[in-house]
Every structure is written in C-alpha cells, then in structure tokens.
Amino acid sequence: MNMLPTLTLISLIILTSPIMLSPLRIHETRNFPHYVKMAVSYAFMVSMVPAMIFMHSGHEAVISNWHWMTIHTLKLSLSFKLDYFSLIFMPVALFVTWSIMEFSLWYMNSDPYINRFFKYLLLFLITMIILITANNLFQLFIGWEGVGIMSFLLIGWWYGRTDANTAALQAMIYNRIGDVGFVAAMAWFLLHSNSWELQQIFLTVPKGNTLPLTGLLLAAMGKSAQFGLHPWLPSAMEGPTPVSALLHSSTMVVAGVFLLIRFHPLMEMNPSILTLTLCVGAITTLFTAICALTQNDIKKIIAFSTSSQLGLMMVTIGINQPHLAFLHICTHAFFKAMLFMCSGSIIHSLGDEQDIRKMGGLYKTLPFTTTALIIGSLALTGMPFLTGFYSKDLIIEAMSSSYTNAWALLITFIATSMTAVYSTRIIFFTLLGQPRYPTLIQINENNPLLTNAIKRLMLGSIFAGFLISSNLPPTTVPPMTMPHHLKFMALAVTLLGFALAIELSSFTYHLKFDYPSHTYKFSNMLGYYPTIIHRSPPHYLLNTSQNLTSTIMDLAWLEKSIPKSLALMQKSASTTISNQKGMIKLYFLSFLISLTLGLLLII
C-alpha cells in the first residue's frame, strides 16, 4: 500500500511537467499542445495502477501527510487522502481530459493562442485533482478556488465578445456567493474543532450541527449550479466547446457534489440537511429539464441536461446514498463529454451554426458523429447496458425504496422521463429529416483527432458503467431487493419519455402557434429567472440611486438650500419690515380713480 502515494505523486509530476518546463520556453513551440496531450495520456496510464491496487487491497483509505507549518495551535499539512473516491475519479478525469485535449487539437487548430489554451486546460485539471485528493479544508479550498478562476479564464476565452465576458463574470459572481458558505464553514470548523483535517472534523464536530453543513450546501449549490444559483451554467456555453466538455463532464460542476460526498459522514446523521439537499436537487432537476425542452441552441440543451443530472446527484445524496452519486459522476463524465464533442463536430461542420432548427439530415453527411450522438443520448437517458443505466437504475431503485419526501422523489421521476424527451428532440432536429442548412457548406469529419477522441469516449459510454459499478463498495446500507414491477421502473420511465417525445413530435409537426403559450414561454425564457434576477434588481437599484442623488443632491442642496432659500428669506424679510402691502395694481387703481374724480369736479 506504500506504492499508492508514490504512484499518485508520479502521475501528478507527469501532469505538471509541461508547466514545470516553462523556463525552457517549451510552451512557445508549436508542439506544446501535443506535449500536454501526451502528458495527460501518460498520467492516465500511471493513475490506473494505484486504482487497480486499491480496488483489490480491501483498504478503506491511505493518507499521506507532509507537515508544512504551524500557526499557534493550528497545524497545516500537505495531506492527501487516497480513498475509493479519489483513486477512481482520477483515471476517469484524466481519460476524459485526454480525449478532450485531442479533440481540442482539431477544434482550436486555427486559434493563435492555442498553447495558452492548453496550459489553461491542464491547470484546470490539476486544480480539480488537488480538490479530490485533499485531506484538509485548506488544500480543498485551494483546489476549489483554482477550478473557479480557471473556469473564469476559459469561459471568457474569446474575450472580444461581450457575451463571453458577461458569462465569465456571471460564473464568477454566482460562485462567489457559494464561496461565502465555504469560507463560513471553514471558519466554523476552525473555531469549534481547531483543525481543518477531515478525520479530526468528523470525530470532534457534533453530528446534529446544521450551521456548517448549511454553508457547505450553499457552496455546493454555487459550484454545481443548483436552483437559485444555476443561471451561470447555460451562460458558460459562450466558451469554446472543449471548455464546455471539460467543465460539464469531470471538473468544475461536479466539485460541489464531490464536496458533499466528502462530508457525508457529517450529513448522514443530520436529517434536516439531507431533506434540504433532496429538495434543492429535486427542484433543480425538474426546473432545468423543463427549460431544456424548448431551447434551440444545441449546446444549451446539453448544458441544461448537465444541470438536471447534477440535481439528480444531489437527490441521491439527499436520500443518503453518496456512493451512487459518485458512480453517477463517473458514468456521466463519459457520455456528457462525448455529447459536447459531437455538438462541437456539428457546429464546426456547419460554420459555427448552433441553432438546431437550422440543421437536419446530418445522419447522411456525418455518420460517425450521428452514431456517437445517438449512443451518448441513449446513455444519458439510461438505456439498459449502456454506461448511464448502471447509475440511473440504481438511483431510481434507491429512490423507489426511500421513505423521505414523496413529492421530491415524484418530481425527480418526472424530470428523469423528460431526459428522454429532450434527447429525442436533439436527435430528431439535428440528424433526421431534410437538411435545413446552406448547401455550399463543406462537411468533413474524417480527421483522426476528432474520430479517435470520440471513439474512446464512445467505448467509455458503453463499458465504463459496468466496470465501475462492479467495483463499487457501498458507503451506506444499500436498499433491499424489490419486486420486478418496481425494478423495471428505470426502464419504464425512459421508455415513457421516448414514447412521449415521439407522440408530441408527430402531433405538433404541422402545428403552428400564432402566439406561444404561457408554458412554452416559461420554459423558453428559463422560468423568467434571468429577467427577474438579472434585470429587475439592477433596474430598481439604479432607479433608487438616481432618485436619491437627483432628489437629495440636486433638488435639496443645489436648488432648495441655497438659491431658493435665499430668495425666500429676503422676500419674507422685506414683507415683514415693509409698511406697505406691495399691492401695486390696487395702488395704481386708487390713484386713477382719485385723478378721474378730481378732473370731473374741476370740469
């Protein structure tokens, strides 16, 4: 078991080598992206060895400590926790990133700053690995903030576009709201347990304490885009497609769920936090599934499906099954990265067109991408014996036998069936029917960088679920065996979604709305949430500040206080000290009457 830290460290050294060799100016050469891709592939191969050793060893965790510094009574160490979660997630993240980097060599080929782009992708991956291997809150916070700042830089990669800048700022602001909860939880743990080591926190913190767990839940809501802090996730589609694939598959968005999995020993004895997590996840998965139904941007549909799956992971943690949430994180990474890469292939082939209404008939011109997109969509919906089935089936089985919050579980079932609806919609609009794009577009997918990357993820989307689930040790008591009619519920929910999608598409194919319905507008405008939150408060605050400045500064001080008040004071003073009333017209009239009478008497 002493080999585990060494092999993991070797994997990290291989990963960081392209950055460590910066003094040699290697990052200025044309081959730097290939060096980075090779480093990630070698790191993946090395990381498979400790994962295999650990799975067959039967150990619970291996912890490596290097003392760093002591501040009064607080001891800070570089501490790595190599347990099932970190050692399984590392190869998954490295494998997916390897494929994404190979895809980026094709997709970002014409970008003049491709070397910097690959360096950012590599740093993004390194900070995520720091986060998952951390054994104390200090290291975890470094990884947490690292993925945050790298997401900001990558979402705003095309900084010449206003939308990209706005999306990057939006991601940063929403994550700062979540970070408030994380920092508050860190402060609470330091105050009450005098340590940031996870084992000491689990031993010393009372199990029923809700305050720090609320902070951690807020942090997870911000990072994993749960309802209320969700708008940044679809906006992040303004970044390049490889960024979307990496962001949504194995790095930033799953960091919040991973944080709650790490702290599940505290959460499992706290029913109020579990219920809150369950309700937040259920609302998120339903709301984002509804929003995905009417979107027309192919990347935004896949982004909302990510948010819906994150809600499902939160529901799984809420029913006290963190190992199933982790299994879904791992399986979800493969097919979600592949779906984004397929959408990138379509967008690139159609001249940066992202509207699914302007696609169609691509199954003839892009057969390989079509195959991958259909397999990815089926895996996302939970089709039996594809990767997504092994996690979604277990999650729905656990939900069916759970006794908490029937309404939350019911809306999660509804949202799961909607997964099949929007997946079918993507297939129907992009691949089937007649072409709706300009005829002079040159479509070509015969590039090894594209096909090899998608092939690897396609194999992962078929076989990875079986391999990971067969080596999954449950961290909590698994649900009991259930009757066959409940066992087939996952398949029934998926088939119901497919049937509903086909029925709706055939029913509404020739249907034209003069005015969109309220339900359609609610879904298409994202529940009016961006309008209410992003426009109304700024409008109200700007109006208030303008009124205050114009009323207090201009009207009160510059107008009423000095000029008008001086005139008013002089007028009232002259009125007070004067003998006459100042009625000039009356005086002239009396003078005229007297003059007239005098003239009449004289004449």
Swiss-Prot record:
The chain crosses the membrane at residues 4-24, 38-58, 87-107, 117-137, 140-160, 171-191, 211-233, 241-261, 273-293, 301-320, 331-351, 366-386, 409-429, 457-477, 488-508, 583-603. Coiled coil: none annotated. Its EC number is 7.1.1.2. InterPro entries: NADH_DH_su5_C (IPR010934), NADHpl_OxRdtase_5_subgr (IPR018393), ND/Mrp_TM (IPR001750), NU5C-like (IPR003945), Proton_antipo_N (IPR001516). GO terms for cellular component: mitochondrial inner membrane. Pfam families: NADH5_C, Proton_antipo_M, Proton_antipo_N. Its main location: mitochondrion. It is an enzyme of class 7 (translocase). Signal peptide: none annotated. It comes from the Eukaryota. It is found in: Mitochondrion inner membrane. It is a multi-pass membrane protein. GO terms for biological process: ATP synthesis coupled electron transport; electron transport coupled proton transport. GO terms for molecular function: NADH dehydrogenase (ubiquinone) activity. It catalyses: a ubiquinone + NADH + 5 H(+)(in) = a ubiquinol + NAD(+) + 4 H(+)(out). Keywords: Electron transport, Membrane, Mitochondrion, Mitochondrion inner membrane, NAD, Respiratory chain, Translocase, Transmembrane, Transmembrane helix, Transport, Ubiquinone. Belongs to the complex I subunit 5 family. Core subunit of the mitochondrial membrane respiratory chain NADH dehydrogenase (Complex I) that is believed to belong to the minimal assembly required for catalysis. Complex I functions in the transfer of electrons from NADH to the respiratory chain. The immediate electron acceptor for the enzyme is believed to be ubiquinone. This is NADH-ubiquinone oxidoreductase chain 5. It comes from Dugong dugon. The gene is MT-ND5.
